[in-house]
Each structure stands twice: as C-alpha cells, then as structure tokens.
C-alpha cells in the first residue's frame, strides 16, 4: 500500500527565515521530539540523513533520506529508504503573512510489520503518516514563532 500525500502548511515567517532554520539540521530534534535519532551533515544534494521516528503508534520507523535536489529558499527533494521507501518533496513559496510549505510524498512500507499494518488497517497506517506530517508542521511553526535558539 502506497501512501500519497500533498499537504500545505502556512508558516509565520518568510522563506528566508524558514530556510535559515531548516539549514540547521543539528536543531531538528529541538522542535521534533518524536525524532528519536537523527544524523545529518547538511541540507545539500547528496547528503544522507539517518532518522529514527517515533510514530503515535507503538513502533519506531528507521529511514534514510537521500537529498536529490536542493534549491535554496524554494525546494528540497529526496529519496526515502529503509522501513518506508519512496519520494518526498518540500516546496516553499512566499505569502503576504509568511510562507507556505508544501509537502508531497509517495511512500510505501517495506518492513514486514508496517506492510502488514498497512494491509489490514490502511486507515491506521495513513493516520500515523499524517500525524507525523501535521504534528511536525505544527511543531515547526511553533518553533519559528518562538524564534530559533543556538548557533547558525
């Protein structure tokens, strides 16, 4: 079962401020407590991010995110592999009151537990996926409103 998403989130800062925040990969766990482990060098083409995600369901998801396209202030595309595989794309556009983050993904479970869950309870699998997206966007917006802390 493939889960395809196309979500849009209004954020309270302009594209430059958002980009400055997401470039600080060492800070991701500050606003995403469900990101249990995260290893990334930078937001640049060719980088491979290793992630352990704690979903709202009782399991961890381990993935590698390989950045395939990075267009500063506008776009990030990636290939996802591991427990879940597929593609993801973030697009940033300006708005009068901040910016919009569009998150598009097409992902399928590869780990047997997750494949089984998606097969017998597709609504539960979609809930877990959407929870990570929506909660993550909300936590990022909250972090942006508070103003990022720490070194650039």
Task: Name each region found by the language model.
Residues 30, 39-84, 135-152:
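Glycine-rich portal/gate segments that line the openings of hydrophobic small-molecule binding cavities
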Residues 12-15, 40-45, 68-73, 91-100:
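A short, structured loop/turn motif at beta-sheet edges
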Residues 2-8, 48, 62, 75, ...:
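Intrinsic-disorder/low-complexity, polar/charged segments enriched in Ser/Thr/Lys/Arg/Asp/Glu/Gln
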Residues 79-134, 151:
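Beta-strand/loop substructures that line and gate deep hydrophobic ligand-binding cavities in soluble
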Residues 1-45, 152:
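Hydrophobic ligand-binding cavity/cleft-lining segments
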Residues 10-14, 52-56, 68, 93-95, ...:
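Solvent-exposed residues in well-ordered beta-strands and their adjoining turns
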């Amino acid at each position: 079962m493939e889960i395809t998403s196309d979500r849009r989130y209004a954020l309270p800062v302009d594209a430059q401020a958002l980009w400055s925040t997401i470039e600080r990969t060492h800070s991701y766990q500050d606003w995403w407590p469900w990101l249990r482990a995260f290893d990334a060098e930078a937001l640049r083409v060719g980088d491979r991010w290793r992630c352990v995600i704690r979903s709202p369901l009782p399991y961890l998801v381990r993935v590698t995110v390989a950045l395939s396209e990075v267009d500063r202030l506008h776009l990030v595309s990636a290939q996802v592999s591991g427990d879940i595989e597929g593609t993801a794309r973030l697009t940033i556009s300006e708005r009068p009151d901040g910016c919009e983050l569009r998150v598009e993904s097409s992902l399928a479970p590869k780990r047997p537990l997750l494949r089984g869950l998606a097969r017998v309870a597709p609504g539960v699998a979609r809930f877990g996926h959407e929870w990570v997206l929506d909660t993550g966007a909300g936590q990022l917006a909250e972090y942006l409103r508070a103003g990022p802390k720490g070194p650039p």
